């Protein structure tokens, strides 16, 4: 999965997919009542990027729905996965469940079209704080009470705080999560970070007792760091330059081993060689 980083304006969906992304990451900010409010990152952000592009969250969802609904004039067949980077650090811990419920209702109405031929992309809820695990249970409760528990089949999870892998496993246990797990590791492109924790996550993914289904690394903008991440065995790379990742995947060393995921590739299944 080539994951376009910080796609917060509707116009950027086309831009990143046209550069080769089959997945996008979108920032979601919340108001003081735990309602998802804007797709907005703010300052500071990655080097070389404008930090302040934004939409109202529900409007962004409508644009995203068009981009992922077959037959729509804005449809992109290859856009198959969306990571919502949930900026819950502005909330109190006891608001996490409410944030999950409100997020689910927004998605149900504006993205999934109340279960009636809505957008088809898989969704990852990426949460920065392990203490906010109830966002997951709240999300699930809301979809169930709204009569659409089947949509949970399209939803996966990530804790994005670079926490100890054992602590992450524990948070999932508390949330009742037993699958659909993506594990992120990374740092802003302004700084360097080694691949030690990525390798631990990959080892967990590949062990019979692991909780991780997929591993992605962020934010990778250079060819050599792309090669290093691929050599470590990641499933996804988040980038400001999807074309750079696509170029490296075309190199002979990687062409035989990796391919760009399509809609038929289940993002919740661990890939077995």
UniProtKB/Swiss-Prot annotation:
Coiled-coil annotated residue ranges, if any: none
CDD domains: GDPD_like_SMaseD_PLD
GO CC terms, sorted: extracellular region
Organism domain of life: Eukaryota
Family stated for the protein in its record: Belongs to the arthropod phospholipase D family. Class II subfamily.
Known catalytic reactions: an N-(acyl)-sphingosylphosphocholine = an N-(acyl)-sphingosyl-1,3-cyclic phosphate + choline; an N-(acyl)-sphingosylphosphoethanolamine = an N-(acyl)-sphingosyl-1,3-cyclic phosphate + ethanolamine; a 1-acyl-sn-glycero-3-phosphocholine = a 1-acyl-sn-glycero-2,3-cyclic phosphate + choline; a 1-acyl-sn-glycero-3-phosphoethanolamine = a 1-acyl-sn-glycero-2,3-cyclic phosphate + ethanolamine
Ligand binding (Mg(2+)): 25, 27, 85
InterPro entries linked: PLC-like_Pdiesterase_TIM-brl (IPR017946)
Active site: 5, 41
Disulfide feature: 45-51, 47-190
Gene Ontology MF annotations: lyase activity; metal ion binding; phosphoric diester hydrolase activity; toxin activity
Protein's recorded name: Dermonecrotic toxin LapSicTox-alphaIB1aiii
Enzyme Commission (EC) number: 4.6.1.-
Gene Ontology biological-process annotations: killing of cells of another organism; lipid catabolic process
Glycosylation sites: 250
Cofactor descriptive note: Binds 1 Mg(2+) ion per subunit.
Organism phylogeny: Eukaryota, Metazoa, Ecdysozoa, Arthropoda, Chelicerata
Keywords: Cytolysis, Dermonecrotic toxin, Disulfide bond, Glycoprotein, Hemolysis, Lipid degradation, Lipid metabolism, Lyase, Magnesium, Metal-binding, Secreted, Toxin
Tissues showing expression: Expressed by the venom gland.
Function statement: Dermonecrotic toxins cleave the phosphodiester linkage between the phosphate and headgroup of certain phospholipids (sphingolipid and lysolipid substrates), forming an alcohol (often choline) and a cyclic phosphate. This toxin acts on sphingomyelin (SM). It may also act on ceramide phosphoethanolamine (CPE), lysophosphatidylcholine (LPC) and lysophosphatidylethanolamine (LPE), but not on lysophosphatidylserine (LPS), and lysophosphatidylglycerol (LPG). It acts by transphosphatidylation, releasing exclusively cyclic phosphate products as second products.
A Pfam family reported for this protein in Swiss-Prot or TrEMBL: GDPD_2
Protein location: Secreted
Cofactor: Mg(2+)
Organism from which the protein derives: Loxosceles apachea (Apache recluse spider)
Top enzyme class: lyase
């Amino acid at each position: 999965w080539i994951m376009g980083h910080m796609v917060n304006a509707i116009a950027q969906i086309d831009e990143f997919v046209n550069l080769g992304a089959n997945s996008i990451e979108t920032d979601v900010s919340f108001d003081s009542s735990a309602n998802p409010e804007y797709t907005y990152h703010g300052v500071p952000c990655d080097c070389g990027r404008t930090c302040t592009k934004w939409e109202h969250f529900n409007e962004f969802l409508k644009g995203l729905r068009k981009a992922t609904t077959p037959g729509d004039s804005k449809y992109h067949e290859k856009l198959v996965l969306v990571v919502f980077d949930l900026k819950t650090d502005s909330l109190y811990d006891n608001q996490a469940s409410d944030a999950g419920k409100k997020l689910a209702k927004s998605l149900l109405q504006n993205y999934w079209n109340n279960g009636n031929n809505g957008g088809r992309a898989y969704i990852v809820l990426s949460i920065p704080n392990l203490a906010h695990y109830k966002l997951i249970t709240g999300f699930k409760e809301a979809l169930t009470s709204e009569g659409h528990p089947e949509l949970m089949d399209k939803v996966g999870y990530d804790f994005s705080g670079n926490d100890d892998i054992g602590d992450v496993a524990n948070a999932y246990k508390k949330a009742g999560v037993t699958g659909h797990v993506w594990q992120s590791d990374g740092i802003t492109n302004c700084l360097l970070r080694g691949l030690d924790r990525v390798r631990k996550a990959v080892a967990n993914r590949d062990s019979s007792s692991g909780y991780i289904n997929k591993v992605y690394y962020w934010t990778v903008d250079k060819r050599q760091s792309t090669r290093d991440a691929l050599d470590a065995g990641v499933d996804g790379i988040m980038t400001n330059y999807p074309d750079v990742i696509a170029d490296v995947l075309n190199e002979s060393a990687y062409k035989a081993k990796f391919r760009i995921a399509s809609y038929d590739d289940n993002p919740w299944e661990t890939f077995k060689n």
